[in-house]
Amino acid sequence: MSKIRVGFGFDVHQLKENHPFIVGGVHLEHHSGAFGHSDADVLLHAICDALLGAANLRDIGYHFSNTDERWRGISSLILLEHVVVLLAEKGWSIGNIDAMICLEAPKINPHVPAMKINIAKAAGISEDDISIKATTNEQLGFIGREEGVVAYAVCLIEK
């Protein structure tokens, strides 16, 4: 009998002027970008947390501490690859990933196909098993003021 689990992930990053803005491994042209220890890819961090949570392997901060210089500036696609290895070591494979990005600008939809390609390659799954959606915060709160970006992710894993 197969076993399935569901995981949920969340991440938030502050936006700062003249920082690179990387979401789903895609560099977005924008006046500000996410600030963080790694490349601050909010989408991939939420996905990593969802996967780790589903497998009961703690969270992204446990595995990739922001006090560890090995992870400074690293591509979050590499972090996702590490997470997939951790899951495989426990016998888990990814069924699907469903994610949501919340930000006012820039528009995400034109970049979704490239994001899905990047995530599929790093996770070793089909693009058809990845859903990425985006919404604004209707100009409310820190997201509406373009001070930050949030991502949520849900995943299904199985063995």
Outline where the language-model segments fall.
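C-terminal edge-of-domain segments
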Residues: 143-159
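Glycine-rich phosphate/pyrophosphate-binding beta-alpha loops
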Residues: 138-140
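Short acidic capping loops at alpha-helix termini that bridge into adjacent secondary structure
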Residues: 126-129
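A glycine- and small-aliphatic-rich helix-loop capping segment at beta-alpha/alpha-beta transitions
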Residues: 20, 118, 146-150
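Pyridoxal 5′-phosphate
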Residues: 132-136
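RNase III-family endoribonuclease catalytic core
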Residues: 2-115, 122-123
